């Protein structure tokens, strides 16, 4: 059963909640677990922003599949490759191999080192680069 939330017109939260964890990154106490935030934009092109930790992978994939409702996934934006953002990259690309990955040059390098296969290729973006997906244009920023 999917568990999604409409955030705005054509933008959906497709992440998942994990109530099992007591510590984030084995350091920071969690009283109510953690939320893995991933968003899906339905525009002229479909765009998935981040994935989720593999511990919630099944729920995450159900959410994405439900919102896509048979549409192809055109792009996967990976903000960085820590497991809470990118652990399900391989599974997403197995389900939607036509999806092109958009990420930073460093994240692209790490994806290759981690052995992720990206059949449709990688579009590397730098500070201030923009990508238009139809009605929505995204500006990419670097953050520590």
Where do the protein language model's features map onto the residues?
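Active-site environment of divalent metal-dependent phosphoester hydrolases
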Residues: 21, 81-86, 108-111
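Conserved beta-strand hairpin/beta-sheet module of binuclear metal-dependent hydrolase folds
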Residues: 4-68
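Active-site metal-binding motif and surrounding structural segment of the metallo-beta-lactamase
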Residues: 44, 55-102
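Metallo-beta-lactamase
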Residues: 5-9, 102-144
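Short catalytic-loop micro-motif centered on adjacent basic/acidic residues
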Residues: 47-50, 75-78, 139-142
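Short glycine-/acidic-enriched loop or helix-start segments at secondary-structure transitions
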Residues: 23-24, 60, 88-89, 112-113
